[in-house]
From Swiss-Prot:
Belongs to the PRA-PH family. This is Phosphoribosyl-ATP pyrophosphatase. Its EC number is 3.6.1.31. Pathway: Amino-acid biosynthesis; L-histidine biosynthesis; L-histidine from 5-phospho-alpha-D-ribose 1-diphosphate: step 2/9. It catalyses: 1-(5-phospho-beta-D-ribosyl)-ATP + H2O = 1-(5-phospho-beta-D-ribosyl)-5'-AMP + diphosphate + H(+). GO terms for cellular component: cytoplasm. The gene is hisE. It is an enzyme of class 3 (hydrolase). It is found in: Cytoplasm. InterPro entries: HisE, PRib-ATP_PPHydrolase-like. It comes from Streptomyces griseus subsp. griseus (strain JCM 4626 / CBS 651.72 / NBRC 13350 / KCC S-0626 / ISP 5235). Signal peptide: none annotated. Pfam families: PRA-PH (PF01503). CDD domains: NTP-PPase_HisE (cd11547).
Amino acid sequence: MANKTFEELFTELQLKAAEGDPATSRTAELVDKGVHAIGKKVVEEAAEVWMAAEYEGKEAAAEEISQLLYHVQVMMVARGISLDDVYAHL
């Protein structure tokens, strides 16, 4: 799998949410299920990041962080929040 930047992933997720089939695209499926379902995944992934960071190695923690970032970006897409909207608060 090719590495993606945060911005490239966000653009890809926007496209999948807009054009993807919920039956074949996890992103489209999550957006279709709504903010509540996505929020549950964000909380789950955040807990997994914590556990991996505390009890596992760097690679496991990095993988869990990537999954958390994915779900946070799906939430952003579902709510119509742009990267610039978030960057304004950094």
